[in-house]
Amino acid sequence: MNRKQQIKKIADHILKLNLTHPTRVGVSGITASGKTTFANELAEGIKKRGLPVTRASIDDFHNPRAIRYAQGKESARGYYEDAHDYTAFKERLLKPLGPNGNLQYDTISHNLITDIPVHNGQLLAQPNMVLIVDGTFLLKKDVEHLFDYKNFVDTDFEIARKRGAKRETEAFGSYVEAEKMFLNRYHAACKMYIDVHNPKECADAVFRNSDLANPEVIFQERK
């Protein structure tokens, strides 16, 4: 079964939920696992069925720089603990779209480049909207219950490191420096996340993405 067919299977499961409020879909996975690509493909597949879809990322809910780098710019623990503003993420995006929510939501709280808060004015969701959110630490225990369907993009650490280092070569000045950052900060933080929260275990679908052309899907019983 090819990639498009596997993603269609996941979309089928999501649309069977038939909720009375927007369906909040989470896409987690280690850094450079392919979360954003997967989330975009899933969004396109659901859009083609005529449903309104909104894409969002936890990376638009960063903490200010002073908080993000309080433990050091290369600190794995700092990245894991301090990168994102989970209060804004939950209160401004996830909860308004859940049961008894008012359907008024934001998809961004902080501008990463200017390092200033963002107040763009709230958006109004349709009850049949599907929200697809990607983020590395998305399925932490105090957040995951706010998603109606949870995906974990499962990619081998070495493969993800090579993909990520290639992607970030320009940002870090060389492939070698980018690879070091993945080893020492990003993926070290991901291992903390996996050890503490076991996100794969709580996922409804595990999307094995080490082989981009031939991914596999494992569906897990909802708990």
Regions found by a protein language model. Name each.
Residues 38:
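Hydrophobic positions on the alpha1 helix immediately C-terminal to the Walker A/P-loop
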Residues 30:
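P-loop (Walker A) phosphate-binding loop of NTP-binding proteins
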Residues 44-54:
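Post-Walker A helix-loop "phosphate-sensing" segment adjacent to the P-loop in P-loop NTPases
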Residues 1-17, 166-170, 184-223:
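NTP-dependent small-molecule kinase module
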Residues 116-170:
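ATP-dependent NMP and nucleoside kinases share a basic, alpha-helical "lid"
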Residues 54, 63-113:
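Conserved nucleotide-sensing/catalytic segment adjacent to the nucleotide-binding pocket
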Residues 35:
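Conserved lysine of the Walker
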